[in-house]
Amino acid sequence: MKVHKGDMVLVISGPDKGAKGKVIAAFPKTEKVLVEGVNRIKKHVANSAPERGAESGGIVTQEAPIHVSNVMVIDADGNPTRVGFRVDENGKKVRVSRRSGKDI
């Protein structure tokens, strides 16, 4: 998957289109990412279940995963870009910006 934890992304489709946020978690098997402040849902949590963002239960607002095709990585210039791969001189695979050609 070309989007990793810690990347800044732009949402390009859906109700939160245009929102920017940091990737909290990436789920490669389902091709989904959890973006900070995007796709927020209300979840009813029991008092005994310690969930992400829950103190003592009740109704909790938290982020839900969105599909990786609905986000674009923001490069160092602040522009949304597609991500490609290249092999560097050490034989390691590196992510590169398709817009500028620089390493991400």
From Swiss-Prot:
Which Gene Ontology biological process is one annotated for this entry?
A: translation
A molecular function (GO) held by this record is: rRNA binding
Positions in coiled-coil regions: none
Annotated PROSITE patterns: RIBOSOMAL_L24 (PS01108)
Question: Which CDD domains does UniProt cross-reference here?
Answer: KOW_RPL26
Q: Which GO cellular component terms, listed alphabetically, does the Swiss-Prot or TrEMBL entry include? A: ribonucleoprotein complex; ribosome
**Is Ribosomal protein tagged as a keyword?**
yes
UniProt keywords (A-Z) are:
Ribonucleoprotein, Ribosomal protein, RNA-binding, rRNA-binding
Which InterPro entries does the record associate with it? Answer: KOW, Rib_uL2_dom2, Ribosomal_uL24, Ribosomal_uL24_CS, Ribosomal_uL24_KOW, Translation_prot_SH3-like_sf
Function, as annotated, reads: One of two assembly initiator proteins, it binds directly to the 5'-end of the 23S rRNA, where it nucleates assembly of the 50S subunit.
The similarity annotation says: Belongs to the universal ribosomal protein uL24 family.
HAMAP family, per the entry: Ribosomal_uL24_B
Could you give the subunit structure recorded for this chain? Part of the 50S ribosomal subunit.
Protein name in the entry: Large ribosomal subunit protein uL24
Origin organism of this chain? Corynebacterium efficiens (strain DSM 44549 / YS-314 / AJ 12310 / JCM 11189 / NBRC 100395)
Lineage here is: Bacteria, Bacillati, Actinomycetota, Actinomycetes, Mycobacteriales
